[in-house]
């Protein structure tokens, strides 16, 4: 067997005796914790300017309701409250038509909703004379769309 080497106790060196690399490491400031990825601090110079908030695009039928109103009664206006009610009314009607046409497509085991399902849904959802006018206007709009 090989003889064991004697272990010498490590001598503690003073700050002056330590190598230059260790002194450089000691001169550095303590390591700062990095902020989490989600919490970035804005630069100091940008703190003076206020950040513009992006608006959510809320789609409404207000401009179209107003155009139809001016076609029918050019001299009459509409309040914002009444406009909100009309917008809600149109959203509700479209929701009912979409649900009904979806049911019709499902009953017929069709994967798509065509103009035929929409037309049948209009006849089922809207009453009497209103359904007839809606169907005729819808057919007119579809033929105009396909011809152009």
UniProtKB/Swiss-Prot annotation:
Residues 1-56 are annotated as: Disordered. It is found in: Nucleus; Chromosome. Keywords: Acetylation, Chromosome, DNA-binding, Isopeptide bond, Methylation, Nucleosome core, Nucleus, Ubl conjugation. The modification N-methylalanine is found at residue 2. Pfam families: Histone (PF00125). Residues 1-35 have a biased composition (Basic and acidic residues). The modification N6-acetyllysine is found at residues 7, 12, 28, 33, 39-40. The modification N6,N6-dimethyllysine is found at residue 13. SUPFAM superfamilies: Histone-fold. Its main location: nucleus. GO terms for molecular function: DNA binding; protein heterodimerization activity; structural constituent of chromatin. InterPro entries: Histone-fold (IPR009072), Histone_H2A/H2B/H3 (IPR007125), Histone_H2B (IPR000558), HISTONE_H2B_site (IPR055333). GO terms for cellular component: chloroplast; extracellular region; nucleosome; nucleus. The modification N,N-dimethylalanine is found at residue 2. The modification N,N,N-trimethylalanine is found at residue 2. Core component of nucleosome. Nucleosomes wrap and compact DNA into chromatin, limiting DNA accessibility to the cellular machineries which require DNA as a template. Histones thereby play a central role in transcription regulation, DNA repair, DNA replication and chromosomal stability. DNA accessibility is regulated via a complex set of post-translational modifications of histones, also called histone code, and nucleosome remodeling. The nucleosome is a histone octamer containing two molecules each of H2A, H2B, H3 and H4 assembled in one H3-H4 heterotetramer and two H2A-H2B heterodimers. The octamer wraps approximately 147 bp of DNA. Interacts with AHL27. Belongs to the histone H2B family. This is Histone H2B.1. It comes from Arabidopsis thaliana (Mouse-ear cress).
């Amino acid at each position: 067997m090989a003889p064991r080497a004697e272990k010498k106790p490590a001598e503690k060196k003073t700050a002056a005796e330590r190598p230059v690399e260790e002194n450089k490491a000691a001169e550095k400031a303590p390591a700062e914790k990095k902020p989490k990825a989600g919490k970035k601090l804005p630069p100091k110079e940008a703190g003076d300017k206020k950040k513009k908030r992006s608006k959510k695009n809320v789609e409404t039928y207000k401009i179209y309701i107003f155009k139809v109103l001016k076609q029918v009664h050019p001299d009459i206006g509409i309040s914002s409250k009444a406009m909100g009610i009309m917008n809600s009314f149109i959203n509700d009607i479209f929701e009912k038509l979409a649900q009904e046409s979806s049911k019709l497509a499902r009953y017929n085991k069709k994967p798509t909703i065509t103009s035929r399902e929409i037309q049948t849904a209009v006849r089922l959802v809207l009453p009497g004379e209103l359904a007839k006018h809606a169907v005729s206007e819808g057919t007119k709009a579809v033929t105009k769309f396909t011809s152009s």
